[in-house]
Amino acid sequence: MIIMNGPWVEKYRPQKLDDIVGQEHIIPRLKRYVEEKSMPNLMFTGPAGVGKTTAALALAREILGEYWRQNFLELNASDARGIDTVRTSIKNFCRLKPVGAPFRIIFLDEVDNMTKDAQHALRREMEMYTKTSSFILSCNYSSKIIDPIQSRCAIFRFLPLKGHQIIKRLEYIAEKENLEYEAHALETIVYFAEGDLRKAINLLQSAASLGEKITESSIYDVVSRARPKDVRKMIKTILDGKFMEARDMLREIMVLQGISGEDMVTQIYQELSRLAMEGEVDGDRYVGLIDAIGEYDFRIREGANPRIQLEALLARFLEHA
């Protein structure tokens, strides 16, 4: 019996900058701020699950020292995106003098979800309290942040983690939790995580909760996604000009494996890209197919019937057979 003790993403969150997985182009620069006991306003941008929040917390611990909790404020812009958040929580925190530290740090996560008005209010607070506080802003898309804020920050672009980096971390957690696992199961987790370590750890914990040895099958039991080999076979079948056979494969995948339309389109894109990288789909054909995938992905997300749209997508693939 596997005994769960809270979310593993928190249990195994690195506490020091040196322990952060990946981001070798960023960590040395952050460590210099620790050495200097000084830092400008920072912006961490990049996809989910790549270490932005972990880096902010580790930096705060190391640069603020013993009293880091008293001098650190964390807010999530997705929970409260209005101007009130900026004018109350941030303003009240910034007005207080640092306690046993050179300055205070405000970490605002998912700041790209703030309204433009809230961002302009934030910019004014950043200007007002430069002597006593520094900001760390985290976002997925820096393009959604107004220029006056970007110009006031040192920008760090976090990259998706590589497969071997994720596997190494999963192996570490599995050892600590005394898990039995197949090596191929971890590779399957990496496939579905797509560079997102948080997603990978959550998948590992979900599979472990089944209380058995972690196998490729147990990963599919918790992930609710199609098996890559089935999607790849369907793509090859339609590109061979066999529409009815490919359509039957599509229906079987969606019905028997319970795959949503959006997930199906995503996996078709992933497997087609892998086929192109392996040289099984030439460049010109790949361009046309990707254009079709983008069109039908949009239609499904706008509410069109997924089954009909996916069969229509196969028909478009037939044009490139």
From Swiss-Prot:
GO cellular component terms attached to this protein's record: DNA replication factor C complex
Q: What is the residue range of the signal peptide feature?
A: none
**Where does the chain bind ATP?**
46-53
Give GO BP annotations, semicolon-separated.
DNA repair; DNA-templated DNA replication
Q: Which InterPro entries match?
A: AAA+_ATPase, ATPase_AAA_core, DNA_pol3_clamp-load_cplx_C, DNA_Rep/Repair_Clamp_Loader, P-loop_NTPase, Rep_factor-C_ssu_arc, Rep_factorC_C, RFC_lid
For this UniProt entry, the molecular function terms from Gene Ontology, in alphabetical order, are:
ATP binding; ATP hydrolysis activity; DNA binding; DNA clamp loader activity
- Keyword list, A-Z: ATP-binding, DNA replication, Nucleotide-binding
SUPFAM superfamilies, per this entry?
P-loop containing nucleoside triphosphate hydrolases, post-AAA+ oligomerization domain-like
Instruction: Give one Pfam family, short name only.
Output: AAA
Cysteine pairs forming cystine bridges in this chain are none
Q: Which family does it belong to?
A: Belongs to the activator 1 small subunits family. RfcS subfamily.
Assembly: Heterohexamer composed of four small subunits (RfcS) and two large subunits (RfcL).
Protein task:
Part of the RFC clamp loader complex which loads the PCNA sliding clamp onto DNA. The complex possesses DNA-dependent ATPase activity which is further stimulated by PCNA. In conjunction with PCNA stimulates DNA synthesis by PolB, relieving inhibition by replication protein A (RPA).
NCBIfam families on file: PRK00440.1
Q: What is this protein called?
A: Replication factor C small subunit
The scientific name of the source species is Methanothermobacter thermautotrophicus (strain ATCC 29096 / DSM 1053 / JCM 10044 / NBRC 100330 / Delta H) (Methanobacterium thermoautotrophicum)
Upper lineage? Archaea, Methanobacteriati, Methanobacteriota, Methanomada group, Methanobacteria
